[in-house]
Structures are given as C-alpha cells and as structure tokens.
Amino acid sequence: MHVTLVHVKVKPERVEDFIAATRANHEGSVREPGNRRFDVLQDPADPSRFLLYEVYASEADATAHKQTAHYLAWRDAVAEMMAEPRQGVPWRGLFPED
C-alpha cells in the first residue's frame, strides 16, 4: 500500500474555488483502479489549510494517478490558488493490510 499525505495552503480568498476543483479531482481519483482511499481534509482552525490523504495499492498506481486527466486538470486549476507550494510526503501503509 502506498500512502501520500499532501499538505496544502491555499490563498484565503480562493478556499471555495480550491474545494470545488478538488472535489472534481477526488471524484475522478476514487474511480481509478488502484485507488484505495482519497480523503480531503480541511483544518477547522485555519480553513485555508488542507490535507489530502491518498492511498493507492502500489507506487505504480500512485504514479499513474499523476497522469490522469482529472489530476492534470486539478493541478493546473489550483496552481494560482496556492499560498505556498504543496508538500507531498510518501508513507508506507502497514495496517490495515490489503
């Protein structure tokens, strides 16, 4: 199992735009064959901070995700919304086992 935690800081005035764009990416991502989970979390103390919790069956599936039309559209759409660069941190999932 391949897990990536993506830390996102959005310009405060673009939060709603980011949520809309990210919903479309989420909806496409959860349909990918290797996707196991794709959660989008918002910090209640700072609504401009988000965490994307992405779980794929393998590293190859996670890499393939970045070539999908929905991901590429999302990446381009949110580029100008970022208050700082996104930080993706890979993790190895232990439990639950696949």
Q: Where on the chain are the PLM-derived regions?
A:
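Short phosphate-engaging motifs
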Residues: R14, S48, H70
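An amphipathic, aromatic/His-enriched active-site/gating alpha helix that lines ligand/cofactor pockets
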Residues: A20, A24-R36, V55-V89
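Short, surface-exposed ligand-recognition loops at beta-strand->loop->(often short) alpha-helix junctions
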Residues: K9-V15
